[in-house]
Amino acid sequence: MRQDVSLLSTSGSQKNPLGNVKIAPGAVVCVESEIKGDVTIGPRTVVHPKARIYAEAGPIIIGEGNLIEEQAFIRNSFPENIAPDSDVEPKTMIIGTNNVFEVGCYSQAMKMGDNNVIESKAFVGRNVILTSGCIIGACCQVDTCEVIPENTVIYGSDCLRRVQTERPQPQTLQLDFLMKILPNYHHLKKTTKNISTPMKS
């Protein structure tokens, strides 16, 4: 049985030997998640099984207290007109604090502030900048080249927009619950000592 546990705990690194995954103490990252490339995960961030984080075109830095649910896909990919083997400067994807990536969402947004929610099966393209307090509604697709203003809600089959008065509340209680429960049922990726995530500006 011990052998099986050790195999599970190393499976992530075997999938991508060139990867450089740094997990801050206090983060909960399940081994069944798939993380490739240069990825830094901040404290109190929870990554569910089957979530995918691919740093292909440059590093991904994920801040504190983010919730990344099952089958969510965060990807720092190459632009469509650039081949993966071409010599381009790596661009860093930065995700702030207290963001929620719901089941089956797909985010390529290169810059994201704090307290945003990308709901189930929503898509956010790489040229979109999410500021803070935004909600991208379930199944909505946002693939424009724009900065989404703070507290914007995009919703419905026509991706209508409105501005809410308050930003979404951080999922503090849910994170606390998941940080207690997930380790009981899933093996976790090992944390990395002495890593620093960018401080809030």
UniProtKB/Swiss-Prot annotation:
The keyword Cytoplasm applies. Member of the pointed-end complex of the dynactin shoulder complex which contains dctn4, dctn5 and dctn6 subunits and Actr10. Within the complex dctn6 forms a heterodimer with dctn5. Interacts with plk1. This is Dynactin subunit 6. Keywords: Centromere, Chromosome, Cytoplasm, Cytoskeleton, Kinetochore. SUPFAM superfamilies: Trimeric LpxA-like enzymes (SSF51161). One of its GO terms (cellular component) is kinetochore. Belongs to the dynactin subunits 5/6 family. Dynactin subunit 6 subfamily. Part of the dynactin complex that activates the molecular motor dynein for ultra-processive transport along microtubules. It is found in: Cytoplasm, Cytoskeleton; Chromosome, Centromere, Kinetochore. InterPro entries: DCTN6, Trimer_LpxA-like_sf. The lineage of its organism: Eukaryota, Metazoa, Chordata, Craniata, Vertebrata.
